[in-house]
Amino acid sequence: MKKVLLALSLVSVFGAVNAAEVAPVVEKQTCEKAVYPKSALMNEETGTVLLSVLVGPDGSVVDSKVDQSSGSKTLDKAAVKIYSSCKFKPAMKDGKPQQAWAKLEHIWSLS
């Protein structure tokens, strides 16, 4: 039986962040558990999904999109679902929460 490896990689915000700005940070413990989709597992699909997630000032996900597909629509949709369930520490500018895009990577791997 194959061992399933899921890797969550974190976050950088588009553009430069200066000392007065802080990027959004995912609170991993709030995310839906990453479960390898059955059909992708049966078809031995793997890959890396690059996502953009728009985080609101309250830390909730406002929008998300796939920037680069894993090559599997099933894995892409599952990654979007996982990160859409997460809460984030919002981006901060001058001590105030801001809406900002974050870039995330999710690696789906069988080993």
PLM features per residue range, with description:
Residues 45-70, 83:
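Short tight loops/turns at secondary-structure junctions
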Residues 20-52, 78-111:
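Short proline/glycine- and basic residue-enriched helix-capping loop/turn segments at helix->loop/beta transitions
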Residues 70-77:
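Soluble non-cytosolic domains of exported or imported proteins
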Residues 11-12, 67, 104:
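Hydrophobic alpha-helical membrane-insertion segments
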Residues 15-19:
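Sec/Tat signal peptide C-region and signal peptidase I cleavage site
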Residues 4-13:
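Sec-dependent N-terminal signal peptides
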